[in-house]
Amino acid sequence: MIHWSLIVSALGVCVAVLGGYCGWILFPNMVHKKVEQSVVIQDGSEQFKRFVNLPQPLNFKVYIFNVTNSDRIQQGAIPIVEEIGPYVYKQFRQKKVKHFSRDGSKISYVQNVHFDFDAVASAPYTQDDRIVALNMHMNAFLQVFEREITDIFQGFANRLNSRLNQTPGVRVLKRLMERIRGKRKSVLQISENDPGLALLLVHLNANLKAVFNDPRSMFVSTSVREYLFDGVRFCINPQGIAKAICNQIKESGSKTIREKSDGSLAFSFFGHKNGSGHEVYEVHTGKGDPMRVLEIQKLDDSHNLQVWLNASSEGETSVCNQINGTDASAYPPFRQRGDSMYIFSADICRSVQLFYQTDIQYQGIPGYRYSIGENFINDIGPEHDNECFCVDKLANVIKRKNGCLYAGALDLTTCLDAPVILTLPHMLGASNEYRKMIRGLKPDAKKHQTFVDVQSLTGTPLQGGKRVQFNMFLKSINRIGITENLPTVLMPAIWVEEGIQLNGEMVAFFKKKLINTLKTLNIVHWATLCGGIGVAVACLIYYIYQRGRVVEPPVK
């Protein structure tokens, strides 16, 4: 007859095997399937509601480079800047869904973004703080003018011809030009080498005052509110040539310049982002392939950008124009150590690769940290297999012989239709060719590197943000008086951090729905495994012990 301890020991082994099976096979498969179901975007689901309205707003922090020696810069001095901020805004995102694809694997939407100033988080800074900053709109106009002078003049021609006979000074100029070059259809239909160009530039210099509010330097004194959102006004009641210039600026289509109700124009960095969106996104819902959830499939009905140089004369799409990854509001699930992932930013017209760095803990939630690699805005050129970013749209600036910018700087001219240069904050990692020309920069990898902490199982972002800086070259432009003595420098304007820190409510929700469940399953796993092994071993020892106590009968 089998001893009861052997039966109990066998049961203990069964319990241990069951615990191992549950902990290493059944529970992971159950969790994996549950996560797959929860991340897929289906009409009416909880994930769909979170997709349409983010559960909490993003943090949008702006740091401004206040210029402390603007008068001396006009005379050729090296710029001195001081960082002020952060000015913190809550960024609310709401998606207006257009439609699902027939098979439910794609969803199209337009995203509306709204910014609310967070006075508490920004204190002691306020939106009414006064700053002296780079006059972005005037500087951009002059540099575009320098690069495309003939096209700009021809663009002005139709408007100006109707005004020439109404403006006495210009009538005289027209007669003089006709004597010099013969009769023309338009006084502006001239080449860059035309001797009459100097006379026209005199009028341009004179009309800069009317266009840009009588500027005394390439810097503007304004409020943070105006510089970032409400707009720095210019083109206030212009006349003659000034009005033609303003009309040309207005019709250039720049997102950062808007027309006011009184007809004037206003420049702001982010005013155009505050309100209804225009770009139509198509993203993967995760149906059929949860690893592709939120992956951008199309932007404005195109799989690729048409911003950067393409790989061949036949128009083969270059790596620079490829749209990869999500919009950084969430990431695909089931992350692994050592992997990488992409985010796409429409603000800089490119995809950015993030690489695994280390394991982290965020308020008791385990995750992985990802950060940009050295290839983000490193050296650009054929020898680095990224020459498609070398648009070479800037004249007479600090750049290499091949026309590409030095390491750490990316020309966004073709992205923003303005000569804006992207760097990391405080020009972190940028070439000394740029950093040596500015005083007051304090690059710090911990403060200025882009990173994101992600819960590895679900792909939920825990904290982190995109950190980038917007700059513009400051330089002397031939025959433009206000720029005559300027040094050639890459001038910082602002840097921004757009990201998230999961708040207490979301942390509690996340722990309740996932972390506590995982802990419970883990406890069940190890309790059954260890308990079963313990019972089996204990009963086996007891059985052996009892066998040893059996007294053999004496031999007769």
From Swiss-Prot:
Protein name listed in UniProt: Sensory neuron membrane protein 2
Cystine bridges: C320-C388, C349-C415
A biological-process GO annotation: cellular response to pheromone
Pfam families in UniProt: CD36
Sequence ranges on the Cytoplasmic membrane side: 1-6, 544-556
Ranges annotated as spanning the membrane: 7-27, 523-543
Broad class of the protein's primary localization: membrane
Organism in which the protein naturally occurs: Drosophila melanogaster (Fruit fly)
Localization in the cell: Cell membrane
GO cellular component annotations of the record: membrane; plasma membrane
Extracellular topological segments: 28-522
Bilayer topology: Multi-pass membrane protein
One annotated GO molecular function: scavenger receptor activity
Alphabetic keyword roster: Cell membrane, Disulfide bond, Glycoprotein, Membrane, Olfaction, Receptor, Sensory transduction, Transmembrane, Transmembrane helix
Chain's role: Plays an olfactory role that is not restricted to pheromone sensitivity.
UniProt note on tissues of expression: Detected in the head and to a lesser extent in legs and wings.
Residues bearing glycans: N66, N274, N310, N324
Family designation: Belongs to the CD36 family.
